[in-house]
Design a protein with these regions (language model features):
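Acidic, low-complexity intrinsically disordered regions
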Residues: 1-203
């Protein structure tokens, strides 16, 4: 599951976020095509205070296609907890015991508009599911306390990036590389696998 902030402040890196999502979808599709025995499903969410869009909801990895320009138009505030909570609830209802789930959260702002979920509820969900083969990663701009935000939600894998085009591009590239390592580890587990999802904390 990929959860991407679509609030107004993302306008500054809108094109990089849009391109990065499509490149990530392509990475997922390629991995699914190369490993047909590894069942992969994709849920892609973008959110602001006016909507939560499920662009993909448990779609087969080989079936995903790029988003259209009109699918990502930043505006509004940042109901971060609602997006995470509702996404987790939906994906959790679609998984079975033993399934591995990778959750990637990307934002450039603090929570400021949630109505259904609060921090405690999100943290409880994250901590419970981390014990059940779920991996949570949190990516934020370097003007945020990224590690503090993630820790408060029970997430330990973090990455931060500067709010500019070059660093946003580098962030998505780093995420895709780490995603491929994650997939490869699922296909061929190694005793020496690094327990840290991201190779580095900053890009």
């Amino acid at each position: 599951m990929i959860i991407v902030d679509e609030s107004g402040s993302m306008c500054a890196i809108r094109q990089q976020a849009f391109s990065g999502m499509n490149e990530t979808l392509q990475t997922i599709k390629i991995c699914a095509e190369q490993n047909p025995d590894l069942e992969q499903y994709v849920t892609l969410i973008t959110f602001d205070s006016n909507h939560t869009n499920f662009h993909y909801n448990n779609a087969e990895g080989m079936a995903v296609v790029p988003l259209k320009e009109s699918d990502y138009r930043p505006g509004g505030c940042t109901p971060l907890y609602d997006a995470i909570g509702s996404g987790i609830a939906k994906v959790n209802a679609q998984t079975q015991d033993g399934d591995s789930v990778l959750v990637t959260i990307i934002t450039d702002g603090y929570e400021n508009a949630s109505r259904e979920y609060d921090l405690k509820m999100v943290k409880n969900l994250v901590e419970k599911l981390t014990e059940q083969h779920w991996t949570f990663t949190f990516i934020g701009t370097d003007d945020l306390d990224v590690e503090g935000m993630a820790s408060s939600m029970g997430i330990r894998h973090t990455l931060s990036f500067a709010r500019n085009e070059e660093q946003a591009d580098a962030m998505f590239k780093e995420e895709r590389e780490c995603r491929m390592c994650f997939y490869n580890e699922m296909i061929e587990p190694t005793a020496s696998a690094d327990v840290t999802y991201f190779k580095k904390k900053h890009v």
